[in-house]
Every structure is written in structure tokens, then in C-alpha cells.
Amino acid sequence: MMMFAIKKKAVSVAIVSIISSLSFAASAAPTATANGGTINFTGKVTDVTCTVKLNGGTNSGTVALPPVSTASLAKSGDVAGMTSFTVSLDNCKSAGATLAAGKTAAVFFEAGADVDSATGLLLNHKASGAGAVALELVDNSNSSHHAIIAGDAAQQANTTKIAIDPQGTTILPYAVRYHATGAATAGDVESSVVYSVMYN
């Protein structure tokens, strides 16, 4: 366990606050041309820090999915083996003091080497592993179990925000499942993702 402010860690975790605030359109910004334009960026830096644990352990770890048959992943879009995991927050503070009421948190799953940039699925990086199989992250906070598109900024609006209680703790529920990208072939599956904790 350790306190995190703005820090990342690969594999099943990483943590922290949110992207720094930027404005790309300064007063001296060049005039947009017919072939270009202006991009404005916004963000927020918070002073919230928490102790972050994956499934009650440390901030990094492994989530093991159950073995499934190729028959359950026979065609593109088939899913199987949904496995729950949690990211828990403890000792959350703001500038060293107790958090004000109404603070919420959610995980943002980031783009990376194991993330398919088109679909947000986690790619199988196991050499000679299962074919036509990826992993799909899921918001497990309610029965809808909607898929999370890793690396997509829309997560900030679409992922359920969970309240941080007055004691500075909360549990963020997620899941992962196999997702067929075709007719699956047998073999091992391994992947990873980096995540950050979004505080609001």
C-alpha cells in the first residue's frame, strides 16, 4: 500500500488524479487554415490522494479468468467467462484533510500496447496463444454490464461514478470477459491494461 497523487503503474493498474489542465488555443494561436483547425484541451488536476488496492491487495496484480470452451466463443461478438474484480480506495484525502461530501471516483482504462485502438478490446499478447480472442472490460456496478472501451475519452461520461464515503473509502466494481473476434482457437490468453482513478 502506498499513497498516490499523480502516478501510473502498468499491468492491472496504475492510479491517480486526472489529466492536467491545458489550453491549446493561446491568444497568439495561429489562424486555422482550410486544411486544419484549432484544438482546445481541457482537464483538471485534483489534490485528492487515496490508497488504491486491486481486489483488496496491492495496487497491481493479476485477475485470473476461468477456462472456457471454444464452443462458447464460436463467432465474432460471443462473450464468456465474465470475472469480477474491484479497485478499492482507502484513506482518501484532499490536501491532507478529510474529503468534502459529494466526491466520487471511477477508473479510466487507458490506451496502450495491449489495447486495440479501434475497439478498446485488450489484445492477447501470449505467443502461440488462443486465436481470435480478446478481453473486454465491463462496468460491473449494475445489471447492464456495459462494455468499457479502453482508451476512449467517453469513459469519463459513461463509466459509473461511485461515491467516496465520509471515511474516505469506496469500492469500484468492474469485470473482464473473453470476447471472440472470430471463431476462437484453443490456447492461453494474456493481456494487460493501465488505469487511472478519476476523482470528481
Predicted regions and their residues:
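Mature extracellular/passenger domains of Gram-negative fimbrial/pilin and adhesin proteins
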Residues: M2-S12, F24-N200
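Bacterial N-terminal signal peptides
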Residues: V13-S21
